[in-house]
């Protein structure tokens, strides 16, 4: 009798849990999007890729009169051997042709980054073998025409370092931020050909430091942002934040500060009108189970002003759920941004977005509008 009663109580608890979770899923599926897009940006938006897959991890460049877009295509956010990188090309950023698909045998592939160095297009990507993505190495391939690509080349001298996006100030020397595959340290490298890299020094150590982006200030100094995860708890961490670092040439001594406006995941930095901006992931609301980086919180792809001592949120882009990891091109007084997002009519939490369809979105922003919303 006692066992029977215990079994009944157990099943009652299971039913309550099932009903509660079902109610939560139903609410999430109906919740309308609350992105705050500044109307002064006069955004034009369209889906570059919408094919039912979980598309993610984008980058964008303009080379030889054409836009090049690359993104990951997978069943979901997590690591899988079937993931591929799709390279597309367009003259207007609206009508895209598929140029090539990249894969690595028996491995997951993600976080592609373009560089145009010495009239050659170089593509850096990260290799991953875990279901919960933890990339462990960087490889590269290159092309002289955007169509024919070399075999994958291992960066054995920098094994374990995960490359982000290189930048140059003089067109000769390129600088590459990279973070350690086990998290916690970011460094700066330099190169003249994009293939052979020399270690410049450490940017930052601590707080599960990873995705690190750089840009040059007008006076030649370098500014850097990095994703600081803190403890990396699935429900977020109040110590999660964005590192902002500034250094004079030769970029070996860094002045550090932290911004708690967001934990800037998937950052891309760019300059316009003597200001530095970032496009990255925004965590708009902090709560008990929705601290910085929580899988239960809403996410946005947003634009920020990056100052030497702080981040300033300027506007969301139309986005929701699993989103961010963008690329940018500035052309003809317009800012073109690619990024990925779940259904922008909804407002999924991050965890639901990870297993849902996500599209590659393009937006066109009049730079005059960006200037207008930027604090002076």
Regions flagged by a language model, labelled:
Residues 22-56, 61-109, 115-266, 270-321, ...:
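Beta-rich carbohydrate-recognition and catalytic domains
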Residues 324-325:
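Active-site pocket scaffolds in enzymes
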Residues 328:
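Hydrophobic, well-ordered secondary-structure elements that form the walls
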């Amino acid at each position: 009798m006692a066992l029977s009663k215990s079994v009944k109580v157990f099943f009652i608890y299971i039913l309550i849990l099932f009903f509660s979770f079902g109610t939560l899923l139903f609410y999430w599926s109906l919740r309308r999007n609350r992105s705050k897009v500044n109307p002064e940006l006069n955004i034009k938006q369209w889906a570059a890729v919408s094919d039912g897959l979980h598309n993610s991890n984008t980058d964008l460049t303009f080379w030889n009169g054409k836009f090049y877009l690359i993104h990951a295509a997978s069943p979901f956010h997590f690591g899988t051997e079937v993931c591929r990188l799709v390279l597309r090309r367009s003259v207007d950023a609206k009508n895209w042709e598929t140029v090539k698909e990249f894969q690595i045998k028996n491995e997951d592939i993600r976080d592609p980054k373009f560089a145009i160095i010495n009239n050659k297009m170089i593509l850096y990507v990260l290799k991953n073998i875990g279901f919960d993505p933890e990339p462990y190495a960087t490889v590269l391939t290159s092309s002289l025409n955007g169509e024919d690509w070399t075999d994958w080349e291992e960066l054995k001298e920098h094994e374990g370092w995960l490359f982000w996006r290189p930048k140059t100030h003089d067109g000769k020397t390129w600088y590459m931020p990279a973070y350690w595959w086990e998290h916690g340290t970011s460094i700066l490298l330099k190169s003249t050909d994009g293939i052979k890299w020399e270690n410049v020094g450490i940017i930052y150590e601590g707080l599960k430091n990873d995705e690190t982006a750089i840009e040059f200030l007008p006076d030649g100094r370098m500014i850097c942002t990095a994703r600081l995860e803190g403890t990396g708890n699935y429900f977020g961490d109040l110590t999660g934040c964005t590192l902002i670092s500034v250094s004079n040439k030769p970029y070996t001594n860094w002045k550090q500060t932290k911004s708690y406006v967001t934990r800037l995941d998937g950052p891309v930095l760019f300059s316009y009108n003597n200001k530095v901006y970032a496009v990255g992931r925004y965590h708009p609301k902090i709560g008990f189970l929705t601290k910085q980086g929580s899988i239960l919180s809403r996410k946005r792809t947003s634009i920020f002003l990056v100052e030497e001592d702080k981040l300033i949120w300027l506007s969301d882009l139309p986005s929701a759920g699993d989103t961010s990891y963008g690329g940018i091109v500035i052309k003809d007084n317009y800012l073109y941004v690619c990024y990925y997002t779940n259904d922008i009519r909804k407002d999924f939490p991050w965890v639901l977005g990870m297993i849902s369809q996500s599209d590659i979105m393009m937006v066109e922003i009049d730079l005059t509008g960006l200037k207008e919303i930027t604090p002076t």
